């Protein structure tokens, strides 16, 4: 608790400096971070190797080990994310709108940083960099609490970040990392209203629901991704196959990977044998409803427990549906509101799907894997929000700000 309180106080104090930093100063800090990540690459990869070995010794499944693992390419991606964020427009100080009253009083709505942000996340060390650079660019200090799986990796990365900040005008304490992995600290952290303006949990359902249900600090809920793809009867089946394979297998341990496949009954006999074979070639365990198993008998029977489950693994459940209406009803029942996709050549069905599906991202003829800050042009992201209030979808720079009213008068008084 002593470490937590001490570091929470530090990020609150540092925010008074950071929120008034210039764009040039913030960009310089992010550039230095990129340089230090490159300089400390070997040290970071060695720390990560230790984390990965420990995870495998504990029997962690490979899809989750993949989320933990770093390599030169992923370090390069972190550096590229820094460069991208440097190139993004600084949202702080933007005049959202303004107007002048009849009496000459001028009112403007101006974008400002939210304040010190607490990030609670699990096994992805790249989150440490992505959240830090977005927080800094948007004028927010950050208190990081990573999972025990990635402790060595995160310590090495944060050490590089803080070393970089020492060479800039940005306070080193703008980024603090909680090294104590005691889970009881999570409860303490999410109740530090005196020091934190926002808490963002990034992880599985258990972590997110715990933070949401117990926090007194406002929470930006990043969501579980039980994502669906519906193959309509009019879909180009040849083009549909690579979309489904991409959505399921590119990185199955991410929240924007497809977990469920819905197939129109009129194309099921033609399409299911093809897509099941292709999925299996990519190492996917295929589960299916009764109608699916009538067509492809050797798929694993799907149970009711499958439909709401986010696998985060090379597993997919298939359901045959009568039409777009049944597909929509199924998605409404089991969706987590993350990313949902329809593959179709029918404009009316596409329009209906987009209109009736309530999710952060709704796709027509595209993989759900695009729900990502970088892919959407936001640079890095701090998470994918599935809530409706304040921010939804990839949370980038603009979503890490709020606003205040600036009112300019000539000694006006209210009549």
From Swiss-Prot:
Cellular component GO terms, alphabetical: cytoplasm
Reactions mediated catalytically: L-glutamate 5-semialdehyde + phosphate + NADP(+) = L-glutamyl 5-phosphate + NADPH + H(+)
Enzyme class (EC, first level): oxidoreductase
MF terms (GO), sorted A to Z: glutamate-5-semialdehyde dehydrogenase activity; NADP binding
Biological process per Gene Ontology, one example term: L-proline biosynthetic process
Keywords, in A-Z order: Amino-acid biosynthesis, Cytoplasm, NADP, Oxidoreductase, Proline biosynthesis
Listed CDD domains: ALDH_F18-19_ProA-GPR (cd07079)
Pfam family, one: Aldedh
Pathway recorded for this protein: Amino-acid biosynthesis; L-proline biosynthesis; L-glutamate 5-semialdehyde from L-glutamate: step 2/2
Cell compartment(s), UniProt: Cytoplasm
E.C. no: 1.2.1.41
PROSITE patterns in alphabetical order: PROA
Domain of life: Bacteria
NCBIfam families per the UniProt record, alphabetical: PRK00197.1, proA
Family indicated by similarity: Belongs to the gamma-glutamyl phosphate reductase family.
Matching PANTHER family: DELTA-1-PYRROLINE-5-CARBOXYLATE SYNTHASE, GLUTAMATE SEMIALDEHYDE DEHYDROGENASE
Biological role stated in the UniProt entry: Catalyzes the NADPH-dependent reduction of L-glutamate 5-phosphate into L-glutamate 5-semialdehyde and phosphate. The product spontaneously undergoes cyclization to form 1-pyrroline-5-carboxylate.
Entry protein name: Gamma-glutamyl phosphate reductase
Species of the source: Thermotoga maritima (strain ATCC 43589 / DSM 3109 / JCM 10099 / NBRC 100826 / MSB8)
